Regions:
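Conserved phosphate/ATP/ADP-binding segment of small-molecule kinases
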Residues: 145-234
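Conserved phosphate-binding/catalytic loop of the ribokinase/pfkB sugar-kinase fold
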Residues: 92-129
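Hydrophobic anchor at the start of a short beta-strand
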Residues: 2, 52-54, 78, 162, ...
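Short beta-strand scaffold segments in enzyme catalytic cores
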Residues: 44, 91-93, 225-229
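Substrate-binding N-lobe of the ribokinase-like
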Residues: 27-87, 299-302
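Positively charged, low-complexity intrinsically disordered leader regions
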Residues: 1-24
Length: 308
């Protein structure tokens, strides 16, 4: 089973505002609104690829029915810990005149120690040997990086393969012995090793340090693709797309693709190719957390892969 953990979920709202500029009164057209958050996006992409998952974490108690109904048609189960307060809203403002996007991120609800303890109990119930548990995204106010590290240890101790996709102190605390996979981008890799990472050799040296802790390291490079370090080898994969329709959630699609391929028994380099194709496919959709398997297969044929 795949378990996605989203501690700081959101509702993603997309507005279209031609000629957007601050300090003015402008008309906006609502294009889309959906339950989101990084782990939620991963679950949605896993479902698109034919996989099953359980989506858990924290959620404003009033929004649980909305999240549940949004997953009714997917091969995913919603099992969140309800907390007081409202789930945050993330707003993307699209300006078609400038072909530009502006992203606004609310802080959202706060969690109490009792909420963290409830999530710990939830994961104790859900996690079983052989499961893959994915911790994705930021932490809500009130939750400390040490809390995340404790949840990671709990799942690893239960015999699960733990994947971490976060940033800042939360990522630094979570990347610890027993973690199966970590997915930093270049900036996050610099944070983890506390120095600049610019050249290929810089990436290799940083990866060598982290590979003492994690089994698989995925370093995402945006338009330049991604690098996978595993089994004392490394590969770099990339694919070009002509038009990017959406940039939100591409890393979540990437991670979903890697995990699903891994559970199919594919070797790391094949998982990387699938992940890169999924991330690129996500740029062809209007909304985060959506990929078309047919587009994934077309892009997969164009993915370049080389030893790194």
């Amino acid at each position: 089973m795949i378990i996605t953990v989203t501690c700081n979920p959101s509702f993603d709202k997309t507005l279209e505002v031609p000629g957007f500029a601050p300090g003015r009164t402008l008309k906006a057209r609502t294009l889309h609104r959906q339950p989101a958050g990084k782990g939620v996006n991963v679950s949605r992409c896993i479902a698109a690829l034919g996989g099953r998952s359980v989506a858990t974490g924290f959620l404003g108690q009033g929004e649980i029915p909305i999240y549940t109904s949004s997953f009714d048609q997917l091969q995913a189960v919603v099992d969140f810990v309800p907390v007081a307060g409202d789930t945050r809203q993330n707003v993307t403002i699209r300006d078609p005149e400038r072909n530009a996007e502006t992203h606004l991120r609310e802080e959202g609800f706060s969690v109490a120690p009792a909420d963290v303890a409830a999530l710990e109990r939830k994961l104790s119930e859900l996690a079983a040997p052989g499961d893959v548990v994915i911790f994705s995204g930021s932490l809500p106010p009130g939750m400390q990086p040490a809390d995340l590290a404790r949840l990671v240890r709990l799942c690893a101790g239960a015999g699960c393969s733990v994947a971490v996709d976060s940033s800042g102190p939360a990522l630094a605390e979570a990347v610890q012995p027993g973690v199966w996979l970590a997915k930093p981008n270049r900036d996050e890799l610099e944070e983890l090793v506390s120095r600049a990472v610019q050249s290929d050799d810089d990436v290799r040296r940083a990866a060598a340090e982290l590979r003492e802790t994690v089994e698989i390291l995925l370093v995402t490079l945006g338009d330049d693709g991604a690098i996978c370090f595993a089994n004392d080898r490394a590969w770099k994969a990339a694919v070009k797309v002509d038009v990017v329709r959406n940039s939100v959630g591409t890393g979540d699609a990437f991670l979903a693709g890697f995990i699903v391929a891994h559970l199919e028994g594919q070797p790391p380099e094949t998982c990387l190719r699938r992940a890169v194709a999924c991330g690129a496919a996500a740029t062809q959709e209007l909304w985060a957390g959506q990929i078309d398997p047919a587009i994934v297969e077309k892009l997969l044929a164009r993915v370049t892969l080389a030893e790194f």
